[in-house]
Amino acid sequence: MHKPSAAARTRPSFVRSLSAPLAAISLAALAACAIPTHPDSSAPPSDPFNPAAIQLIDDTSWQLASWRNADGTQRELPPQDQGANGQPAVPTLTLSTADGVRRAAGFSGCNRFGGTYAVKNGLLSFGPLAGTRMACPNSAGGKLEAPYLDALAHVTKAGLQMQAPQQLYLVTQDGATLTFSRRDTP
């Protein structure tokens, strides 16, 4: 009968002894992917439009919190509970690098959308965004969808507030400011 070598007999215990440290290192690496928060919550907020801040946008998820038009008026957003199929009608935006490509996805008030995004020289920009084709012409979310997707296509300035509550600011070509609140789940 063939008897396993000493190295073969010790390999499983060696592998088992590495399992816990490897798991701890993996968890630490995942935690490092989160947007850093400012260590001093009493410090004045930093400039969210600092070009370095937007570089931290990858692998985050956001929900539209407010929309201020260029003239200072607020665009009305749908209530949280008015979406189709129990889905909130308030638009969302998720920015992911899970497959090695910067991908944007979200909910635009009526339909889901997806496409690519880029971060260059402190500017966040979106490639063509494709969406599903549900019809929601009379819903609050449906009325917001076309302007929302148009705003994403015309971002001229982006800012990221890292101090709680974390917020993403997108300023459009026509001067509107969309403010997003951080979502814990994508």
Predicted regions and their residues:
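Lipid interaction determinants
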Residues: 2-11, 16-19, 33-186
